[in-house]
Every structure is written in C-alpha cells, then in structure tokens.
C-alpha cells in the first residue's frame, strides 16, 4: 500500500520518493518490518496462546526431553502469516501477478493449517483435518497456480532465438517460430541474428546442466496442437506435485525446535536472490539465466518471508516458547513450492 501510495504521489516531488522504486530498498523495509512484527506482536500472541492454554500435544517418540515440551503453545504460525501479510501489503506491488499468487498461497495453505490445528486443539481430535482433505486442498492450489501460469498473459519469459538471413536479405524464422515478431530486440546483428521474444513457456531453470534450462515439452510425445496441450498438461501436473511435496515436506520437517523455521529461512534467501536475478534483464543476461519479467517482486515477498521467520526463531529456537503448528509449516512449504516454480 505504501508502494502504491508513493506511485499516486509521484507528481508531488516528495523527498525520498524515488527510493520506493528500488526493489532492494523495498525488500529491506519488508524484511525489517516483518521481523519487528514477529518479535513484538509475536510476544503478545504467545501470551494469549498461553492464557487460553492452546498447547501442543506431544507424542512419546522416546526422544530425550521431549515430554518437557508438553503444553508449549502451538498455532504460532499465525505470527508468521501476520508478519508476512502486513509487510507484503505495505511494500509489494499488489498489481503484480506473482505477488497475488504468493499472497493467495499464503492465505490458502495457512487456512488449511489453521483448520487442522483448530480441530486438534479445540475439538480435542489428535488427528486434526483428515489427510485426504488436506491433500485435496493442496492439489486444488496446485491446479490454480498451474492454470494461472498457463493462461495469464503477465506470466511470460524472454527467450533468445536464432533468426537466419539469406544472402539476399530474406529472413528465415526457426521451425516452430512462425509467429515471431521480427522487430523484436536484436541482440547480435550479423548474418544470423540472436533475437529476444517474450513468450509463454514451459521451460524451467535447472542448475548444474548445460544451458541451465529444461523444457517440459520435451516430455510430450506429440507435435502440433496436441503437443501444445500435452506439454501444458505435463507442466501443470508437475506444478501440483512440487507444491504438494513442498508443503507436506515442510510439515514433516517441523519436529524440532527451530528446524523448519531455520531451514526455510535459508531456502527463502536463495529463492529471493534467484528471483531478483531472474527479474533483472542485465543480470540474467550476464549470468545466462532465464529472464522472467516481474519476478523481482518475488524477491520483495521473500524478504518479508525471511524477516518473519527470523523474528519467529527468537521464540522457536531451543528451548522453544512456541510451535508454529500446521498453520505455519503448511504455509511455509506452500510459499517455497510456489515461489520456486515461478522462477
């Protein structure tokens, strides 16, 4: 909201207004704000949870000192969700499709986890929400994200293609690129041009392989119209698998003091850096990685994510004063999965 407020006031020459246009400045503010919210608002939430006796039920796994944690407040993931949401609303570009998807993911997965914790704590049902329903709702989220990536015109990549020219100056487009705009930005001007074209793509970035890219259309056994449908079906299916796996994987990781929050913060730092690089034309070209317009906002969101987790770690590290519960772990995993897919 602050970002959009400064956009509305750009004609009034307010001192320091230009700083809000820098991703790095907004990322710093988002991180610090989320951390402070986790630290100070989190303390009040923990006291409220203790007062209401919203404690964790501990299963006896034979681990040393584990029964001492019985009664420790749970549902602390509310602290993380609150810090991320407020910081994101203040400093992110809310018109950006990537920001919208990540906010939706946070609320969706947080809602699943909150419902699960609520059933466990207030309904005194140790099983919580049934595994079937949790899985179904995660799969639904995967399809929503996948179909948005497939059909939303704002989610594109800039690909380099090679355009051959004959001696008489006639331009020949590569096979499958008959709709390429020949007036696209020319990168190298010689007998064979390297040009850039903004397109919908099923490519993803993979480290440690030549060219760093893998295209899911390579898995399609068909060509032409059926090939187009098949490659997107495979791509959406992979998105569903990644989101479901990340969400449940983080949920399983949340078994020791500070483990899920600490490791997720490290993952968030890496994703934030990669998102910033992918969203910057100069840096992505220099590092030979895919340029994805608009993903810089993911870096701002992940900064809020990191700040919220670091603030929460103050209370969650050993000896833990609060547990995040499924409210936090499912949301954290969903955020990691979706943000990794988008870059």
Identify the residue ranges that each predicted region occupies.
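Cytosolic, membrane-interface loops and tails of multi-pass inner-membrane proteins
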Residues: 45-68, 118-127, 190, 199-212
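Glycine-/proline-rich flexible loop or hinge segments
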Residues: 26-33, 62-71
